[in-house]
Amino acid sequence: MIQIDALPAFSDNYIWLLQDTANRRCAVVDPGDDAPVLAWLGKHPGWVLEAILVTHHHHDHVGGVEALKHATGAQVFGPANERIPARDIALEDGAQVHVLGLAFDVLAMPGHTLGHIAYYTAQSPTPLLFSGDTLFAAGCGRLFEGTPEQMHHSLQRLAALPEQTQVYCAHEYTLSNLRFARAVEPHSEPVQQRFEAVTQLRADNRISLPSTIGIERQTNPFLRTAEISVKQKADEWKGHSNPTQASVFAALRSWKDVF
């Protein structure tokens, strides 16, 4: 059984800490800062950091990699098509990574960056997805390198995963994302209920993650481009009809960028 905890970093990043409590082994996902990880290891003597999983090259995801590798000897996994510091294993779509007794499938997720990857496993009691900055709770990453078509395809690929899949994204953006979701679907009861629940969580200084694929299908406008009401709002924003789901996505993303 793997336990997963969030190590907060910077203003809104989460470094995900995977723990094999029976064997005192652990792994981290996207350590943008080494300090929170080293602090945790310092409080847990006898634990071994054996793997570092990286989704993409942005500094707030890789800034702590080299120091952690130097301190612990952990093996570093990351996308083949991006420059990842201290990377040992370069990963492409369809690869499989074995970490803490779980086999993670590597999914290419171009959009936020061109080489972005996600890690997915169905081997745990509940399927797990580490989506980096591709799929957020109620949102998605900005398009720094890829096209709207690429990002839409990446998100649709994630939306097809089992609905019970737990989604561990890299930032606490949920509340602001839900404000946008309410603008897109103002009459959606699931969106409103989620907004109220997350508002309370954040007021209590609790994190809003993980989400699930099922919740995202209901409340994330970027996964709901096939819905007529979502298309209508996208058309209103652009001032013309968006003929494809990818163009609906592009309209939503451009709207969110200035929301």
Swiss-Prot record:
Q: Does the keyword Zinc apply?
A: yes
Pathway(s) it belongs to? Secondary metabolite metabolism; methylglyoxal degradation; (R)-lactate from methylglyoxal: step 2/2
Enzyme Commission (EC) number:
3.1.2.6
Residues bound to Zn(2+) 2:
60-61, 133, 171
Alphabetically ordered keywords of this record = Hydrolase, Metal-binding, Zinc
Which cofactors are reported in the record for this sequence?
Zn(2+)
What top-tier enzyme class does this entry carry? Answer: hydrolase
Note on cofactor: Binds 2 Zn(2+) ions per subunit.
- One of this protein's GO BP terms? methylglyoxal catabolic process to D-lactate via S-lactoyl-glutathione
Q: Which NCBIfam families match?
A: GSH_gloB (TIGR03413)
The task this protein performs is described as: Thiolesterase that catalyzes the hydrolysis of S-D-lactoyl-glutathione to form glutathione and D-lactic acid.
User: Can you say what this protein is called?
Assistant: Hydroxyacylglutathione hydrolase
Q: What does the organism's lineage look like at the top?
A: Bacteria, Pseudomonadati, Pseudomonadota, Gammaproteobacteria, Pseudomonadales
